[in-house]
C-alpha cells in the first residue's frame, strides 16, 4: 500500500494536467474512485487544477440513492461542484457505460472542463485485456486502455493506470454488491478467471499488462515505418504486400470509430479495395466507400436534407464563399489566370447547388445530361461529388467541376449584362 504523497511523487513528472485547469472526476463511490477524488482534492493546488465531481446513479440497488446523497454532502462540505445523472432505460453493462460517458461529455462541454479523470488502475487494464481475448478481439485492441486519450473537448486521463489496486490506500467507500454478480463478464473475469490464472502464474496480471504495452509499441512502430505511404492512394496501396495492406486498412479505419466493421466485413472491404473496381459500396451505419481510378475514400452518407441546406443563393452585385470557391461580380485588379469569368444574360439571383437527377445543360444545337457529361469526360467520383451547378431563371448556366467550367450556350438574341467571377480559395 502506498501513501498519496508516494503516488504523487511517481506521477508528477508525467505532467498529466500540464494543459488543464478545470478537471472533472468520474466518481462512483467505490474504493478506486474515492481514492482518486481524495488524491486530486489534496493535491489540486500542487497540480494547479480545480476539480468537479460527476456521478451517475444507475438506480439498480437500494443503496444507490444514499451513495448519491453522501457524495452531494461531501461535495458541499468541500465546496466542490457536483453533477449527477440518473440512468434511464434497459440496464446492461454497455448501456450503462454509454450513458456515463455521454453524461461526462455533456458536463465537460457545458461547464468548460478540459479533462475527464477516471480511476482505472493496472488490474482494470488486465481485466480489459482478458475480456477482449475472450471476446476474440483483434490484435490491435489488445493494446488495452491508454493513460491519456482524446475525449469530448479535451482529454480522458487515467493517472492510476500504472498502479495496482493493492497500491491504493484504505479509504471510506461504498461496496457495490452488483460487483459480485456473475451475470456480468467483467465480474466473472475479476472474481473467477483471474484468481484461477494467478494460481498458475502469480504474475499473470503483470504479464497481461506487458502484452498490452508491447502490442501498443508494435502498432506504433508499424505506423512510424509506414507513415510515408498514402493509404488511400490505390497505386501506393497495391504496391504493398497483402500483410501490410491488411494493417494499413486497419490504421485507416481507426479514423472511423463508430463504423465498427466485423471481421468478415473488413475482409470484404479489403477485397473491394484490392480489386479497385470503381463505384460506390455501402458499408454500414451510414458509411460508404467510393473508389475512382486513383484512390478510395470512406465517407459518411449525407442525408438529402443536408444536401438541400447546402444550396446557396447569390444575388446580383453581392459575393459569397461556397465550398472551395469565392463568387463575386467584380474582377480582380491584377490579371489572374486562375479566375473564371462567366457571362450573364440576366441579373436575377443564381442558385449554387450540387448535381441533381435529370440535370442537363444546353450547348446550343443540343443539350446534354450532366450525368452523361461527367461520364464522357471521365471525371472521378470525388470530382463529381464536389461539382457545383449554377442555376439562373430555372436554367443551368454553368457547371464547375475539377479544373473545368462548362457554360450554357447563349441564344442568338441574348445580350450580356454582367459577368460572374469565380476564384479558387487558398487552403491555409
Curated annotation (Swiss-Prot):
Entry-linked HAMAP family: tRNA_Ile_lys_synt (MF_01161)
The species this protein was found in: Streptococcus pyogenes serotype M1
Binding residues for ATP: 28-33
Keyword ATP-binding listed: yes
Job description of the protein: Ligates lysine onto the cytidine present at position 34 of the AUA codon-specific tRNA(Ile) that contains the anticodon CAU, in an ATP-dependent manner. Cytidine is converted to lysidine, thus changing the amino acid specificity of the tRNA from methionine to isoleucine.
Disulfide bonding pattern of the chain: none
GO terms of biological process kind: tRNA modification
Family designation: Belongs to the tRNA(Ile)-lysidine synthase family.
Name this polypeptide is given: tRNA(Ile)-lysidine synthase
Amino acid at each position: 500500500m502506498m501513501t498519496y504523497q508516494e503516488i504523487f511523487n511517481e506521477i508528477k513528472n508525467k505532467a498529466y494536467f500540464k494543459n488543464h485547469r478545470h478537471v472533472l472526476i468520474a466518481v462512483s463511490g467505490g474504493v478506486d474512485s474515492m481514492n482518486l477524488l481524495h488524491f486530486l482534492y489534496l493535491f489540486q493546488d500542487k497540480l494547479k487544477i480545480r476539480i468537479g465531481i460527476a456521478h451517475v446513479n444507475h438506480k439498480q440497488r437500494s443503496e444507490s440513492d444514499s451513495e448519491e446523497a453522501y457524495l452531494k454532502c461531501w461535495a458541499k462540505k468541500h465546496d466542490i461542484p457536483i453533477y449527477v445523472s440518473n440512468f434511464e432505460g434497459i440496464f446492461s453493462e454497455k448501456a450503462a457505460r454509454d450513458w456515463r460517458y455521454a453524461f461526462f461529455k455533456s458536463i465537460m462541454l457545458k461547464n468548460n472542463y478540459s479533462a475527464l479523470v477516471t480511476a482505472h488502475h493496472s488490474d482494470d487494464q488486465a481485466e480489459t485485456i482478458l475480456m477482449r481475448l475472450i471476446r476474440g478481439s483483434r490484435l490491435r485492441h489488445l493494446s488495452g486502455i491508454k493513460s491519456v486519450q482524446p475525449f469530448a473537448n479535451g482529454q480522458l486521463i487515467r493517472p492510476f493506470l500504472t498502479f495496482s489496486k493493492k497500491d491504493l490506500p484504505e479509504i471510506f467507500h461504498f461496496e457495490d454488491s452488483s460487483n459480485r454478480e456473475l451475470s456480468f463478464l467483467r465480474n466473472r473475469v475479476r472474481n473467477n478467471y483471474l484468481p484461477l490464472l494467478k494460481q498458475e502464474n502469480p504474475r499473470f496480471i503483470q504479464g497481461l499488462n506487458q502484452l498490452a504495452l508491447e502490442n501498443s509499441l508494435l502498432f506504433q512502430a508499424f505506423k512510424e515505418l509506414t507513415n510515408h505511404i498514402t493509404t488511400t492512394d490505390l497505386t501506393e496501396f497495391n504496391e504493398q504486400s497483402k500483410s501490410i495492406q491488411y494493417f494499413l486498412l486497419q490504421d485507416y479505419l481507426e479514423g472511423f470509430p463508430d463504423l465498427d466493421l466485423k471481421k468478415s466485413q473488413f475482409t470484404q472491404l479489403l477485397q473491394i479495395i484490392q480489386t479497385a473496381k470503381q463505384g460506390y459500396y455501402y458499408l454500414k451505419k451510414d458509411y460508404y466507400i467510393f473508389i475512382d481510378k486513383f484512390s478510395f475514400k470512406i465517407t459518411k452518407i449525407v442525408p438529402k436534407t443536408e444536401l438541400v441546406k447546402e444550396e446557396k443563393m447569390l444575388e446580383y452585385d453581392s459575393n459569397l464563399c461556397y465550398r472551395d470557391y469565392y463568387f463575386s461580380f467584380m474582377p480582380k485588379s491584377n490579371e489572374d489566370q486562375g479566375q473564371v469569368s462567366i457571362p450573364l444574360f440576366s441579373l436575377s439571383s443564381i442558385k449554387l447547388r450540387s448535381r441533381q437527377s435529370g440535370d442537363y445543360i444546353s450547348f446550343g444545337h443540343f443539350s446534354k445530361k450532366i450525368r452523361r457529361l461527367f461520364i464522357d469526360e471521365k471525371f472521378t467520383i470525388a470530382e463529381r461529388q464536389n461539382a457545383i451547378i449554377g442555376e439562373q431563371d430555372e436554367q443551368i448556366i454553368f457547371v464547375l467541376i475539377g479544373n473545368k467550367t462548362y457554360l450554357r450556350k447563349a441564344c442568338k438574341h441574348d445580350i450580356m449584362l454582367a459577368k460572374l467571377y469565380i476564384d479558387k480559395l487558398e487552403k491555409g
